[in-house]
Design a protein with these regions (language model features):
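Short, flexible helix-loop junctions that flank or precede catalytic/ligand sites
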Residues: 1-196
Length: 196
């Protein structure tokens, strides 16, 4: 019958929705439809497989969307990770080693007090974790970042500009949750890439 994801998406657009949620952009056809819809003043939410927020921008460029279109249609780029939460039933404090702290980029001299981990219990099936929470990395599209996108800048340049504009990395967001006793250092290492 010739029904494809792209043709279905075009059919949805004929209904003139105010907001469009696209499960995932995997190819240039879907990306092209999403970009054109966003450029006509509609709000589009979608997902793209990438390691972090700057990588999402370069992924859209790699799919084949023109830099001026990518720069014009994005308002916010966000990366997220779901991390395991320490079980509240068996949560216990411990003093981290200087090596542990240094491994994730924390200054051992600045960390005061205990960090936490779960020792394992029946509530968490002896894992030390129960439930999940999200950590986020967001890039509001500032003028300077748009300019880099228009120029087809590489991922590192986009990342640096985003950091200069206050972006909190996934690792930094995770470490904030370590320091407030919600997740473990191991979860930060497992779920985030090492900062350069």
């Amino acid at each position: 019958i010739g029904l494809t994801f792209g043709s279905t998406l075009r059919s949805v657009l004929r209904q003139d929705p105010d907001v469009l949620l696209i499960g995932e952009i995997r190819d240039s056809e879907t990306a092209d439809i999403a970009v054109k819809f966003a450029l006509t003043g509609h709000l589009v939410f979608t997902t793209v497989h990438a390691n972090d927020a700057p990588g999402t921008i370069t992924r859209l460029l790699d799919i084949g969307i023109a830099p001026f279109l990518v720069g014009s249609c994005l308002n916010l780029v966000m990366a997220q990770r779901l991390v395991r939460r320490i079980c509240e039933n068996c949560k216990e404090g411990y003093t981290p080693t200087a090596e542990e702290l240094t491994l994730v980029g924390l200054d051992p001299g600045l960390v005061k007090g205990d960090l936490y981990r779960g020792k394992g219990c029946t509530e968490c099936r002896n894992t030390g974790y129960k439930g999940r929470l999200a950590i986020f990395e967001m890039i509001p599209m500032a003028r300077e970042i748009r300019k880099l996108v228009y120029e087809s800048a590489n991922e590192d340049d986009i990342r640096q500009s985003a950091l200069d504009h206050g972006m909190v990395t996934l690792r930094e967001a995770g470490l904030a949750r370590v320091l407030d006793g919600t997740i473990t250092i191991e979860e930060v290492i497992r779920s985030t890439v090492e900062e350069l």
